[in-house]
Curated annotation (Swiss-Prot):
Subcellular location, record wording: Virion; Host cytoplasm
Spans of repeat Sequence: 155-161, 162-169, 170-177
Alphabetical UniProt keywords: Capsid protein, Cytoplasmic inwards viral transport, DNA-binding, Host cytoplasm, Host-virus interaction, Microtubular inwards viral transport, Phosphoprotein, Repeat, RNA-binding, T=4 icosahedral capsid protein, Viral penetration into host nucleus, Virion, Virus entry into host cell
Gene3D superfamilies on file: Viral capsid, core domain supefamily, Hepatitis B virus
Summary of subunit composition and partner proteins: Homodimerizes, then multimerizes. Interacts with cytosol exposed regions of viral L glycoprotein present in the reticulum-to-Golgi compartment. Interacts with human FLNB. Phosphorylated form interacts with host importin alpha; this interaction depends on the exposure of the NLS, which itself depends upon genome maturation and/or phosphorylation of the capsid protein. Interacts with host NUP153.
Sequence segments annotated as region (3 X 8 AA repeats of S-P-R-R-R-[PR]-S-Q): 155-177
Species: Hepatitis B virus genotype D subtype ayw (isolate Italy/CI/1992)
Modified residues (Phosphoserine): 155, 162, 170
Official protein name in the record: Capsid protein
Amino acid sequence: MDIDPYKEFGATVELLSFLPSDFFPSVRDLLDTASALYREALESPEHCSPHHTALRQAILCWGELMTLATWVGVNLEDPASRDLVVSYVNTNMGLKFRQLLWFHISCLTFGRETVIEYLVAFGVWIRTPPAYRPPNAPILSTLPETTVVRRRGRSPRRRTPSPRRRRSQSPRRRRSQSRESQC
């Protein structure tokens, strides 16, 4: 069976594979982050979101994998075999869990669309030959797309002040909702 754990979230294993393995924090750091940010929601019997559910499952599976690794460590007497098993788990399974945990924590933190846009932008950047791409990789942030970054060396253009507008004589309208109350 070819199961892609990211498909229902609009991403793919291939899309995450563009990020180098050293990009992802350690499983321990990711578990600490998930616990610090989302412990209450993860331990709640209530359904919060598909990302919370996926994160719960990944955390439980990692715990089971560590139980198995401990068992193997205790029961495999051949040190070379034990080292091979530990190396395989850390290299292959560890990376998959680091990717999975990072993806769902990032989606909860930044929003799914932002994370998908980042993965696509990074994928385009990494596949562009170095001579034709910007020196710095895209970064995952919450800054809006409309942020303008000025080039160094140029002085900013002086703007002429705009003429003052006449205020209307009618009373000011109030907004029906404040920005903070919107989700």
